[in-house]
Amino acid sequence: MNGRGSHSASATTKSFQRLNFEKYEAILSDLDGVITKTARLHAAAWKRLFDDYLQRFTAKTGRTFKPFDLEEDYRVHLDGKPRQDGVRDFLKSRGVSLPLGSPGDHADRETFYGLGNQKDRYFDSALEKTGVDVYPGTVEFLRLAKRSGLKMAVVSSSHHCAQILDAVGLTALFDVRVDGHEIDRLQLPGNPAPDGFLEAARRLVVPPRRAIVIEDALAGVEAGHAGAFGLVIGVNRRNQADALRDKGAHIVVEDLAELLPGRTEPSSSPPR
């Protein structure tokens, strides 16, 4: 037990569906790793950025560094966070400090923002080459919720959110979008602070206790818990179910298709 709410294995998908469509008014969903299979592209872009940067840093200083780990470093330091915060946290783990800079920094500037902007260039290149796939279970679940009358918001630290939603034909699914551009414009703190999700709930005119947060990132689940949202669903894409629960997820699923009518029982129960 983590102290962030009791979990029971007695909940069935049927009971969860009843809560979904009668108790709650809105869904606030992350994008990368929940709706679209773009998390791996982000991780690869970060690896390209940091491995190159640390090699150049080694050439200048003689210090050596452990290369970026696609699984552990992405999950712990970057997933779900604004770019500049992720750059700061990863470099701190390697004992490197840089100035914050500003959002408009050129990609060759050695600042948190500058490196983040270079990462976006790498991501754009990968996206153009590979395209975007969705998680069908997520799309089916969100469309069912929309048809059932729930308001919908996408909340993402990504600056590519609108572009990706358009590419997969899901723009019209959402009533509100709070993405990296909006987070920068409003100067909101990123995950694990709840401000992005709270802003989405405010725009939807839905109190947090009546909204569901869906996240695959530990920092995002922590944000949902910090915002006192009525239900936080953790999507376990990286074999971290226990960690998602520890951060405050009420329910953890491998795929949101598990929560569709007639599917199997979720791994823990929603709050009553």
Task: Indicate residue ranges for each PLM-predicted region.
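Receiver (REC) domain switch/active-site residues of two-component response regulators
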Residues: 175-176, 230, 249-250
